[in-house]
């Protein structure tokens, strides 16, 4: 660089004598050294043209202009008579860019960083820019505590003035915090304050969020947490005076010293509201009701400001300014809050637009909107629209933004940006157990048929004990007011004996329909009617089965298999509460569904059934990557008019949807087969499950970030650790002396609770939804069958 400057300077001085004070007229311009850059492109960048009279100043500007293009490492301008000779040395072209040794920084991030600095394949190499990139990357490593890190750019020359660029990283190890000292704290111990830090010099095994590795960003967050801790407890004059970060000589250890001044505690003396409140002073006054005499609380003040902004936002004032200036009285230790409010203009919505919905029709999204066009902008309605789109389950992500209209002082467009996920599936299920072997299921489901929002499903299963087919349809907006219409038809040929359930065969078919009515944003009711035909055969003499047949007026023969047919009409009713944040992989909210079914006159059976299903998600960190999920299912059914609940309507538990680790439907009462004289067989109880008329299932899950997986995939992959529990019982069971003498359990008691624990992985893969679980029974009973590993695989479409 020094030689280049010297050459240019000498050239300019030397040319003064050659060109003369009046310069000369350029008759031709000749380039030497051009390879990649075209002559025409170089001429366009020069301020001098053929026919111009040039001077020393013009030559200097020419050299500067050519350097400014970034294409040349060296430029020299010479004169040969009336011809300008421009000698250049082009910068080499980057042929490839590779990285080596980078673990903390992904290749994609590095490429984006280089792109921003105009370092890319096919561009000229600027060595000065490389030096800046090296320093910038090293500064990044220093900020995350890797003080031994180094970054070197290795440039390898290639033919035709090309180079390979390789960034070589030596990341080293992260410096660990040896000690954090807090100086100046009087009211609270250092341990109490450090418990609120992410950075720690000693991390307990149970603390999943703390970290001993130094990061500048985390220290900044910890200092802010320390400041908030004191401000929330009345210390209005609290101040962090200084922070020192010291390295050990080997650069592997960090000592942090925080010097602070606590000050005294201050109380609120009053609140003064000022400014343009757009006529909502009474509502704002209620939001600013901080009790005089209470300790000053910074978080409470911030919440008050946000509440005022949200209130004004609901009434169309999209960009209000709310600033609180505390007036501190050091003499009586009080703070008066002066809240300055400027509501600004009221904004109206010009258009609501959608992007990213390549399959889903605009009308499907638009019907979920509660914000109307040409109405004033309501921030709560805009956010509600986002929640409702998320709840559909059609999209991986939903984002919304308001865009101001250029030239308009009071108009905005509301733009929802969605990323669609595959809502259709051609799937098959696979289960494996040490005793059950392998089973299969196949089906097709499209929750967003042709982008209309309608759900269409065709499901079928074929295995050793069942042939099942079902066709279902749901239109969630049968009417413009959101009344839904749905129905299904099905056929089932079920051989329970082959499924290791109580021995019988049931050929059934039916049809059902329902109407759903929205009550408000989170509640809905549905009413339906169904018809089911059941044709039972091959019924072996068994206590629960014979008890049901006798209640129906039948007199089954203990010496032969029984047959029975029933046609039933039933009224169904349901209530659903749903405030989940999204329909797929929720992270917060509750969904509860209460369903009931009762037979109506004209039916052979007389019974009712009620079920309550609840799922509740509670995020435990701000990013919602750690979530607690609680699930439960309660069910009860019984006969009416002296009849019993049909045994084929019993509840069952066990399997991937209830208690994982146990074989499907295996938990609960077992079949008690009878001899010809009506006494229980000596091998009773059998291992065949018969279910019961009552059920309780509960599950607790900890949803965690998936190890070794980038956070950007959190919307498509979910990992959880779980504990499942459940039981099924028969409230009509007669625990007689005969049963006791045979050692048969009392199936009328709900206390035989099964428990399992395990891990689950759900993945919405490009090939379809995959669900894996591995669970081990913790508490089981004689006759239970385990199925520790279960998974389902599907293909989306």
UniProtKB/Swiss-Prot annotation:
One GO biological process term: protein insertion into membrane
Annotated GO CC locations: Bam protein complex
HAMAP family: OM_assembly_BamA
Subunit structure of this chain's protein: Part of the Bam complex, which is composed of the outer membrane protein BamA, and four lipoproteins BamB, BamC, BamD and BamE.
Stated family: Belongs to the BamA family.
Function: Part of the outer membrane protein assembly complex, which is involved in assembly and insertion of beta-barrel proteins into the outer membrane. Constitutes, with BamD, the core component of the assembly machinery.
Official protein name in the record: Outer membrane protein assembly factor BamA
Organism, as annotated: Photorhabdus luminescens
């Amino acid at each position: 660089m020094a030689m280049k400057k010297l050459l240019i300077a000498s050239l300019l001085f030397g040319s003064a004598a050659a060109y003369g004070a009046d310069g000369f007229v350029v008759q031709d311009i000749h380039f030497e050294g051009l390879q990649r850059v075209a002559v025409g492109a170089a001429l366009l960048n020069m301020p001098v043209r053929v026919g111009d009279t040039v001077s020393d100043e013009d030559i200097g500007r020419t050299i500067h202009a050519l350097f400014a293009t970034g294409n040349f490492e060296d430029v020299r301008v010479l004169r040969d008579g009336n011809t300008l000779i421009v000698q250049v040395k082009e910068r080499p072209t980057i042929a490839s860019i590779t990285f080596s040794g980078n673990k903390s920084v992904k290749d994609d991030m590095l490429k984006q960083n280089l792109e921003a600095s105009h370092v890319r394949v096919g561009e000229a190499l600027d060595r000065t820019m490389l030096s800046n990139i090296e320093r910038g990357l090293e500064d990044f490593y220093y900020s995350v505590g890797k003080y031994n890190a180094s970054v070197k750019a290795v440039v390898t020359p290639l033919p035709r003035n090309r180079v390979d660029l390789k960034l070589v990283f030596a990341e080293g190890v992260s410096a660990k915090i040896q000690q954090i000292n807090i100086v100046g704290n009087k009211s609270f111990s250092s341990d109490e304050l450090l418990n609120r830090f992410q950075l720690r010099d000693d991390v307990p095994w149970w603390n999943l969020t703390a970290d001993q590795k130094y990061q500048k960003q985390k220290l900044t967050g910890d200092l802010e947490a320390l400041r908030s801790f004191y401000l929330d407890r009345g210390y209005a004059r609290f101040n962090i005076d200084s922070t020192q970060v010291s390295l050990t000589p080997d650069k592997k250890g960090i000592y942090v010293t925080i010097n602070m001044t606590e000050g005294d505690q201050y109380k609120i003396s009053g609140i003064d509201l000022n400014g343009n409140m757009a006529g909502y002073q009474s509502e704002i006054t209620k939001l600013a009701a901080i009790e005089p005499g209470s300790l000053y609380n910074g978080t409470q003040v911030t919440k008050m400001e946000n509440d005022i902004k949200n209130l004004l936002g609901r009434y169309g004032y999209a960009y209000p300014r709310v600033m609180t200036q505390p007036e501190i009285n050091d003499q009586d230790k009080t703070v008066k809050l002066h809240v300055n409010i400027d509501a600004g203009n009221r904004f109206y919505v010009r258009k609501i637009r959608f992007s990213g919905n390549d399959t889903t029709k605009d009308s499907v999204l638009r019907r979920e909107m509660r914000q109307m066009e040409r109405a004033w902008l309501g921030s709560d309605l805009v956010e509600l629209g986002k929640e409702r789109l998320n709840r559909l389950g059609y999209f991986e992500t939903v984002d919304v933004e308001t865009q101001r209209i250029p030239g308009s002082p009071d108009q905005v467009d509301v733009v929802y940006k969605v990323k669609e996920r595959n809502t259709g599936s051609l799937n098959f299920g696979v289960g494996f157990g040490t005793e059950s072997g392998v089973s299969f299921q196949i089906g097709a489901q499209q929750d967003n048929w042709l982008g209309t929002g309608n759900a269409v499903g065709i499901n079928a299963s074929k295995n050793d004990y069942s042939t099942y087919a079902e066709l279902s349809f749901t239109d969630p907006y049968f009417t413009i007011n959101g009344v839904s219409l749905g129905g299904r038809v099905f056929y089932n040929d079920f051989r329970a004996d082959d499924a290791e359930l109580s021995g019988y065969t049931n050929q059934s078919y039916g049809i059902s329909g329902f109407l759903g009515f929205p009550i408000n944003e989170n509640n809905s009711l549905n009413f339906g009617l169904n018809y089911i035909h059941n044709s039972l055969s091959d019924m072996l003499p068994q206590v629960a089965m014979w008890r049901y047949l006798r209640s129906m007026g039948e007199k089954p023969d203990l010496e032969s298999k029984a047959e029975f047919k029933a046609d039933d009409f039933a009224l169904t009713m349901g209530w659903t509460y749903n405030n989940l944040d999204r329909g797929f992989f929720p992270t917060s909210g509750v969904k509860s569904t209460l369903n009931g079914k009762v037979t109506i006159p004209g039916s052979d059976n007389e019974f009712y059934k009620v079920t309550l299903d609840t799922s509740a998600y509670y995020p435990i960190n701000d990013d919602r990557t750690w979530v607690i999920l609680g699930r439960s299912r309660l069910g009860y059914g019984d006969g009416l008019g002296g009849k019993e609940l049909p045994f084929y309507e019993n509840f069952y538990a066990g399997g991937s949807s209830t208690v994982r680790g146990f074989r499907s439907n295996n938990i609960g009462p077992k079949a008690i087969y009878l001899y010809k004289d009506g006494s229980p067989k000596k091998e009773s109880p059998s291992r065949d499950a018969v279910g019961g008329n009552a059920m309780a299932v509960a599950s607790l899950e900890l949803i965690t970030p998936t190890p070794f997986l980038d956070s950007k995939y959190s919307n498509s992959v979910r990992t959880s650790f779980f504990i499942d529990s459940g039981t099924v019982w028969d409230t009509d069971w007669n625990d007689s002396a005969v049963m006791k003498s045979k050692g048969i359990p009392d199936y009328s008691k709900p206390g035989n609770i099964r428990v399992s624990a395990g891990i689950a992985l759900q993945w919405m893969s490009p090939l379809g939804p995959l669900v894996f679980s591995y669970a081990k029974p913790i508490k089981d009973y004689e006759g239970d069958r385990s199925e520790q590993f279960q998974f389902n695989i599907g293909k989306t479409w």
